[in-house]
Amino acid sequence: MGSKETKNTSRRDFLIKGAGAAALGAGAFAISQVPLLEKLASANEDTVKDLLPFPELIESDEIIIRMQNDVRRALKKPLNEIQWIMVIDLKKCVGCSSCTVACVSENVLPPGVVYRPVIEEEIGTFPNVTKKFTPRPCMQCEHPPCTKVCPIGATYKSEDGIVAIDYDKCIGCRYCITACPYGARTFDWGEYHTENTPEIMQYEKEPNYEYGVERVREKKNSPIGNARKCHFCKHRLHKGMLSMCVTTCIGRATYIGDKNDPESLVAELIASPRVMRLKEELGTEPNVYYLT
């Protein structure tokens, strides 16, 4: 019995003294944890109870919930009164490419088809060198050059401002790919990631739901043989969900919402003096804004 009491006492002293040492380095934060450490110290060896609760929400969660509410509020309006825009904070982007990977997964993208690459640049002169990361989705231009060159109108600007592709009409001429000044369009050549293995893996046979249509990639069927591009996950937005790249961004650098809603987070962000758009001099009026 005496041995157990000695063990618990030494454990208590160790934890509380450790908190005191940490307080010297971490200030008020460490001091605020002393009550928690006292509870830990007095707990049984095998059972820890009555811990202080975590906060219900952290800041990044609040941002996600706010955008979710913005999207659902926008959907109460007619589509032609919505203007979907994306805002990307370059100071928060860490170049992890989680948005790129999530987009590939959401849209079941094949090799060579990337809707949201992250462009990496090296800035400065050695040894004062840093890296800059720029996610580059489709700009959903207000005046898109791609729609003007399509000979059959397969690519068009939809009511909510998103530039879309009708896979059933697209003939694969690739004029739109050449016309895009942002390099935001790619072509589906019908390849598979697991093409040179004994069989195509099941995950590549899963359907995607681009533009609200369920499709399975199969030879000789769309979207194989079509131009393809980012569409802000239009199929998710119209169901009240956020774009996949927005929800998976580790740095919370990507935002989406209705530009026409003055209460939306994106409307607030684009009022910042830090805002810029790519190649504005071309007159395309891109609907992707960057915070520098």
Swiss-Prot record:
[4Fe-4S] cluster 3 binds at residues 138, 141, 146, 180. GO terms for cellular component: extracellular region. The keyword Transmembrane does not apply. Its EC number is 1.97.1.14. Residues 84-113, 129-160, 161-190 form the 4Fe-4S ferredoxin-type domain. It is found in: Secreted. One of its GO terms (molecular function) is 4 iron, 4 sulfur cluster binding. Pfam families: Fer4_11. [4Fe-4S] cluster 4 binds at residues 150, 170, 173, 176. InterPro entries: 4Fe4S_Fe-S-bd (IPR017896), 4Fe4S_Fe_S_CS (IPR017900), ET_IronSulfur_Cluster-Binding (IPR050954), TAT_signal (IPR006311). SUPFAM superfamilies: 4Fe-4S ferredoxins. Transmembrane segments: none annotated. It catalyses: selenite + a quinone + H2O = selenate + a quinol. Predicted to be exported by the Tat system. The position of the signal peptide cleavage has not been experimentally proven. This is Selenate reductase subunit B. The gene is srdB.
